[in-house]
Amino acid sequence: MVSMRDLLECGVHFGHQTRRWNPKMKKFIFGERKGIYVIDLQKTLRYFRYTYNIVRDAAAEGKTILFVGTKKQAGGAIKEYAEKCGMPYVNHRWLGGMMTNFGTIRQSIRKLEVIEKMEEDGSIKLLTKKEALMLTRKKEKLLAYLGGIRYMKTQPDMIFVIDTVKEKIAVQEANRLRIPVVAPLDTNCDPDLVTYPIPGNDDAIRSVQLFCQEMAEAINEGKALREQDGEALVNEEKEITDEEKKEVLDEAMSEEDFGEEQE
């Protein structure tokens, strides 16, 4: 579990410039130095350890925790640590409705599965070069936006977010659906929007990596407890039909842009 030394070495205590702050974060601020707010690491440590246990217990109950972080400093760590603990993630861009309109998102994921099946069974080779190219392009777009959540069959039970200001749409959707939000809170964030806050820097790469690493460790610890109880996850695959293949091909050939569709 995280230590005070870890927090200091990763710069978790450095907040934003004093002119960029949310007054609701005042209770988490230790002081100010050279125009930068310094976060109270005693409180960070306490909240961190409490939240670690919350996340561990959620994983032990078999719950799905969605990792979200699309900015440059977060994308790599979000993907790396979500994969290390076998959880879904969004690190490219949050598409509006990813949780509130999850049925439509699942339909798009199904299209990805159809294209991959066509590649696997060789039916894509029966198409013209242009048709095959359009399907490949559609697959690349679907993978970029939805690859991290392709195995998420239902809405998540909890989300872990890096930068709640940038990911405000994801946080709003979670709040609307009453899905608990876990997140580091920098001095410009609104703590009222987060169920389990951890006051800390959400911009520095090392700080972001520490948060992601600790959440992954908590999840793996919880999963290990679940395995001891003999719980197992069964993943059922639905057979892909020729009709589905034709529908996806027709859509790809119409040159519909997935990213623009979901704005």
Swiss-Prot record:
One of its GO terms (cellular component) is cytosolic small ribosomal subunit. Residues 250-263 have a biased composition (Acidic residues). Signal peptide: none annotated. Residues 230-249 have a biased composition (Basic and acidic residues). Residues 230-263 are annotated as: Disordered. One of its GO terms (molecular function) is structural constituent of ribosome. One of its GO terms (biological process) is translation. Pfam families: Ribosomal_S2 (PF00318). Keywords: Ribonucleoprotein, Ribosomal protein. Belongs to the universal ribosomal protein uS2 family. This is Small ribosomal subunit protein uS2. It comes from Campylobacter jejuni subsp. jejuni serotype O:2 (strain ATCC 700819 / NCTC 11168). The gene is rpsB.
